[in-house]
């Protein structure tokens, strides 16, 4: 309850800068530590449960079944394997990306994630944490450009909660999506999004 009241309080405050209303380190920074959250990816698979966008530069058009696992390869640096489908791909496809953290909206603690695709044609993307409970879910902001208060939202959920997403996670996603009049869609559709168990 305390988390939800803080979120609502921050959303109602007007910021003189172009920062999103939730970009308030003093009040909400303890729920937006990027590296603290990313360390959870080393222990379990996370699924993109919901999103407000339909197209991604890597996952393609009408992407679905997006999930990620990661392993640490350096100080605050991860090697991530992302699985996804889209309207042209009915089988899961892999994308390998290097993930680091950065400071967005003048924060003193890293609250953003930078993804760099691996391979001959690299692409770089930057997202920002809106909320993390550091065990079940993350709400991520995908800005139109660095420093913008306009963009899309994503809800990532751990593998052990994807079939029963905690209400606080769904509420936070829905609340900020409607602030920008965005429509939330389900990216995780059903159990067919889960990769087949590894064969021994």
UniProtKB/Swiss-Prot annotation:
**Superkingdom of this entry's organism?**
Eukaryota
GO cellular component terms, semicolon-separated: extracellular region
Q: Name one GO molecular function term.
A: amine binding
Q: Which residues form the signal peptide?
A: 1-18
Q: Which residues bind histamine 1?
A: 37, 56, 59, 97, 125, 138, 154
The disulfides recorded in the entry are: 65-193, 137-169
Subcellular compartments:
Secreted
Is Signal a UniProt keyword of this protein? Answer: yes
> What does the UniProt record tell us about how this protein is modified after translation?
N-glycosylated.
For this chain's UniProt record, which GO biological process terms are given?
A: symbiont-mediated perturbation of host defenses
List the Pfam families: His_binding (PF02098)
Q: What is its main location?
A: secreted
> Which InterPro entries does the record match to this protein?
Calycin, Tick_his-bd
Which tissues is it found in, per the record? Expressed in salivary glands.
- State where histamine 2 binds: 37, 41, 115, 138, 156
Which of this chain's residues carry glycans? 79
TM ranges: none
Entry keyword set: Disulfide bond, Glycoprotein, Secreted, Signal
- Protein function: Salivary tick protein that acts by scavenging histamine at the wound site, outcompeting histamine receptors for histamine, thereby overcoming host inflammatory responses. Binds histamine with a high-affinity (Kd=1.2 nM). Contains two binding histamine sites (H and L), that appear to bind histamine with differing affinities.
Annotated family: Belongs to the calycin superfamily. Histamine-binding salivary protein family.
Q: What is known of its domains?
A: Contains 2 sites/pockets that bind histamine with different affinities. Site H (high affinity) is indicated here as binding to histamine 1, and site L (low affinity) is indicated as binding to histamine 2.
How this chain assembles, per its entry, is: Homodimer; disulcde-linked.
Q: Per its record, how is this protein called by name?
A: Male-specific histamine-binding salivary protein
Its organism's taxonomic lineage begins at:
Eukaryota, Metazoa, Ecdysozoa, Arthropoda, Chelicerata
């Amino acid at each position: 309850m305390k988390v939800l009241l803080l979120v609502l309080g921050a959303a109602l405050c007007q910021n003189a800068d172009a920062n999103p209303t939730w970009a308030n380190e003093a009040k909400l920074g303890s729920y937006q530590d990027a590296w603290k959250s990313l360390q959870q990816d080393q222990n379990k698979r996370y699924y993109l449960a919901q999103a407000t966008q339909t197209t991604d530069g890597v996952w393609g058009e009408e992407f679905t079944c997006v999930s990620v696992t990661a392993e640490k390869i350096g100080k605050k640096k991860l090697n991530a394997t992302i699985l996804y489908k889209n309207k042209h791909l009915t089988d899961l496809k892999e994308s390998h990306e290097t993930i680091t953290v950065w400071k967005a909206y003048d924060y003193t603690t890293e609250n953003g994630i930078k993804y760099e695709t691996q391979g001959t044609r690299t692409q770089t993307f930057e997202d920002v944490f809106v909320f993390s409970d550091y065990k079940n879910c993350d709400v991520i902001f995908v800005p139109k450009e660095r420093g913008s208060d306009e963009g899309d939202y994503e809800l990532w959920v751990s593998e052990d909660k994807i079939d029963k997403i905690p209400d606080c996670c769904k509420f936070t996603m829905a609340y900020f999506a409607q602030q920008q009049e965005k429509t939330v869609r389900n990216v995780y559709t059903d159990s067919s999004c889960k990769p087949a168990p590894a064969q021994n």
